[in-house]
Amino acid sequence: MLTSGTILLAGSLLSPNPGLIFWTAITFVIVLLILKKIAWGPIIGALEEREKGIQSSIDRAEKAKDEAEAILRKNRELLSKADAESEKIVREGKEYAEKLRTDITEKAHTEAAKMIASAKEEIEQEKRRALDVLRNEVADLAVLGAERIIRESLNADMQKKVVASMIQDMSSKRN
């Protein structure tokens, strides 16, 4: 329940009272002077310390950023060098493989040519042997055949001439 005295007091607070304003201002100035004497220095010191801490953090952050950028540049350079080195290794590997392929191909061609030449030589030797054997057999058969024919009509000198003539004919046909 409200009394009339309470209402009066509330009304007086809302109306300006010069004495109250004066004492409030004096109290405010005294509190301000006390705060300046006692608390202003530590508050300013704390603010300055905080400012220094923030500035130090900013400086460290900038330094870390610069270091990170330097590391990033260095890493990019290393990556570029690694790429160049890998390209060089791949290129050298391809060149080596191509050289090796060429060497193997040349060696195979050389070996094949040697084998072909050797086979031709063997064939030629076998051909000569076969022709020699054939010539001897033909000569023997011719001698036998001629001997039979000539026995009846020729003597020994004539037989030798006929055989020599046949051998000569065979040799000239071969060459």
UniProtKB/Swiss-Prot annotation:
GO cellular component: plasma membrane; proton-transporting ATP synthase complex
Pfam family, one: ATP-synt_B
Membrane topology: Single-pass membrane protein
Molecular function via GO: proton-transporting ATP synthase activity, rotational mechanism; proton-transporting ATPase activity, rotational mechanism
Membrane spanning residue stretches: 20-40
Keywords attached to this entry: ATP synthesis, Cell inner membrane, Cell membrane, CF(0), Hydrogen ion transport, Ion transport, Membrane, Transmembrane, Transmembrane helix, Transport
Family to which the UniProt record says this protein belongs: Belongs to the ATPase B chain family.
Function: F(1)F(0) ATP synthase produces ATP from ADP in the presence of a proton or sodium gradient. F-type ATPases consist of two structural domains, F(1) containing the extramembraneous catalytic core and F(0) containing the membrane proton channel, linked together by a central stalk and a peripheral stalk. During catalysis, ATP synthesis in the catalytic domain of F(1) is coupled via a rotary mechanism of the central stalk subunits to proton translocation.
Name of this protein: ATP synthase subunit b
Native source organism of the sequence: Chlorobium chlorochromatii (strain CaD3)
Gene encoding the protein: atpF
